[in-house]
Amino acid sequence: MQRIENINAATMTDDKGYGLIQDATVIINKGKIEFVGAAFDAPATPTAEVIDGNGGLLTPGLIDCHTHLVWAGSRANEFAQRLHGASYQEIAEQGGGIKSTVKATREASAEELLTLALERAETLMSQGVTTIEVKSGYGLDLENERKQLTVARQLAEQLPVNIKTTLLAAHAVPPEFKDNADGYIEEIIQNILPTLANEGLVDAVDAFCESIGFSPAQTEKVFKTAKDLELPIKLHAEQITNQKGAKLAADYQALSADHLEQLDEEGVKAMAENGTVAVLLPGAFYFLRDTQKPPVELLRKHGVPMAIATDANPGSSPIHNLPLMLQMAATFFHMTPEECLRGVTVNAAKALGENQRGVIAEGCYADLALWSCKDAAELTYQFGVNPLKTLWFNGVAHDRVSKPWSAR
């Protein structure tokens, strides 16, 4: 049993704000939160280990709810191309983009992919992240999608972090199905998806519904199969063009629709009606030098929960810093500090279907982060620094500096 004292706790349990408790005490027992409240209300725990928070800020452990963490290769050359004027879409149409990463990832061994992914995951953890969603989508066939998802599962075996896996086989058309997207969709729904689901490798299913990806009709076939397998769905939607993907996802009760720069009010309303979370990805917006912002005001108006994630990937968001995304979301998308912190805690948990994480509440997992700052707004305000002091995974404390969670 642990007793964390002398802290301000941002519980994230109210509707819009931080749910802040000044001079709080949190009691952890058997990996879960047994008590959270004002210090003067806390029960006696004479045998507990007492941890002095030194007046710091305690938040839920951060949740990165959209990453592509398992890949090989580099896309630095495409970064240079874009600086010379090429667009993300032009590069993709010339065989670059996702397809170049597919080639490198297929050629890499599972051991090589695990080594790369461990380093990326540890970087996120060192900044306060306790849950990471990891997508496939750089294999695009049964063998290599399995390889990616297996590596994602191995991250959770070698590190204390909570991993949620998402099958993103419908990410791009692989070379063996060139000019035959419909044929590849059939391969996904007849073989890849049911096989990997039956192997227990899939927590959710995603697709890239876009002019350079898959059509709404093709995407819907994937959704129907996922629903038949009782798997939750997510969607890359409305990043480059409006394909009405967000509405389609919402109609299938998707956990989330992600990117959303081109989202319209019809899609927002559908998301609100079906409880679909809007996952905003300011790192991709920044890196691609986009100018069309997601409709944050419409999302607010209709009460759609907004989450924030890194979209960590080699092509459009080579970023492994979730706290930086708070600052970018505030600066680029005009989100408030409260919205930003909610976006990487309670709303990010909703985007993954996690109902016992993302808040500091009795009965929930003790995934917690202690920061040296006193004001919760500082986590959004400052960037380029790391105020994390201690991280708890299921009630086990880890000091950031010593990083005793390291698998290597």
Swiss-Prot record:
The keyword Endoplasmic reticulum appears for this protein: no
Entry keyword annotation includes Nuclease: no
Gene Ontology MF: a single term: zinc ion binding
Residues that coordinate or bind N-formimidoyl-L-glutamate: 138, 313, 315
Compartment list: Cytoplasm
Record: residues binding Zn(2+): 66, 68, 236, 311
One GO term (biological process): L-histidine catabolic process to glutamate and formamide
Cofactor: Zn(2+); Fe(3+)
EC number: 3.5.2.7
Stored Gene3D superfamilies: Metal-dependent hydrolases, Urease, subunit C, domain 1
Pfam families, per database record: Amidohydro_1
Cofactor note: Binds 1 zinc or iron ion per subunit.
GO CC term, one of those recorded: cytoplasm
Reactions catalysed: 4-imidazolone-5-propanoate + H2O = N-formimidoyl-L-glutamate
Pathway connected to this protein: Amino-acid degradation; L-histidine degradation into L-glutamate; N-formimidoyl-L-glutamate from L-histidine: step 3/3
Binding site for Fe(3+): 66, 68, 236, 311
Catalytic EC class: hydrolase
Amino acids binding 4-imidazolone-5-propanoate: 75, 138, 171, 239, 316
UniProt entry keywords in alphabetical sequence: Cytoplasm, Histidine metabolism, Hydrolase, Iron, Metal-binding, Zinc
Highest taxon of source: Bacteria
Family membership noted in the UniProt record: Belongs to the metallo-dependent hydrolases superfamily. HutI family.
HAMAP family referenced in this protein's UniProt entry, alphabetically: HutI (MF_00372)
Function comment: Catalyzes the hydrolytic cleavage of the carbon-nitrogen bond in imidazolone-5-propanoate to yield N-formimidoyl-L-glutamate. It is the third step in the universal histidine degradation pathway.
Protein name stated in the entry: Imidazolonepropionase
